[in-house]
Regions:
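Active-site signature of alpha/beta-hydrolase-fold catalytic machinery across serine-
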Residues: 62, 146, 150
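Loop-to-helix element that buttresses phosphate recognition and phosphoryl-transfer chemistry
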Residues: 2-59, 109-121
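Generic beta-sheet signal
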Residues: 6, 46, 131-142
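Domain-level recognition of soluble alpha/beta enzyme cores
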Residues: 154-181
């Protein structure tokens, strides 16, 4: 059995995030100085993966000149809600929005449900179990949430907030485990 160190990093902030909108394929807003710190911290990764969207590729390029896009790391398919402001949905599709928030099987937007996203991410995590080394994957808040739910086997999907450039670490050595690194960046392995 091989050991894996998987670090999931949320892409840098986008305008859609600042405006509380469902995303489109937009670029990151800027390249914050936090990216330099993260890039240095994870420079020794054996693989750098990212979602296929522009914002994940731009962020991943801080870690590796040629990150490998992985379709399994793509954002949730928001269907007709792509680019829509949450406040507009609260006014115009309040019942649909509430159904989506409260029922992980619901996909009133015509895209992917939280359960479908979770199944996709679970399959991706299972596919990594034959790998070894340190993998950095730059992806989206919902993908990070789904990965956490797989690891902790919980149902608290909507109780997890994933900020831009947040980094969580998952390790596999027979079972997936969530590791919360401390603030001692010099001593972090």
């Amino acid at each position: 059995m091989q050991s894996i160190r998987l670090t999931l990093i949320c892409h840098a902030r986008t305008v859609a995030q600042k405006l509380a909108r469902f995303p489109t394929n937009e670029p990151v807003e800027n390249q914050p100085s936090a990216l330099v710190t993260l890039a240095t911290r994870f420079a020794s990764a054996s693989h750098v993966l990212c979602g296929p969207e522009l914002r994940t590729r731009q962020t991943a390029e801080w870690f590796c000149a040629t990150p490998q896009a992985d379709e399994a790391l793509r954002d949730c398919d928001w269907g007709r809600w792509h680019g829509q402001a949450i406040k507009d949905l609260q006014l115009n599709e309040a019942e649909a929005l509430q159904a989506w928030i409260s029922d992980p099987h619901a996909a009133p937007h015509g895209g992917e449900s939280v359960m479908q996203l979770g199944a996709r991410v679970a399959a991706w995590l299972a596919s990594l179990q034959g790998e070894s080394g340190h993998i950095v994957a730059v992806t989206h808040p919902f993908v990070v949430r789904a990965a956490l739910m797989q690891v902790v086997q919980g149902l608290a999907f909507n109780a997890i907030d994933v900020e831009p450039l947040a980094a969580i670490e998952l390790r596999f050595n027979g079972i997936w485990r969530l590791r919360l690194p401390g603030n001692d960046l010099a001593g972090a392995l």
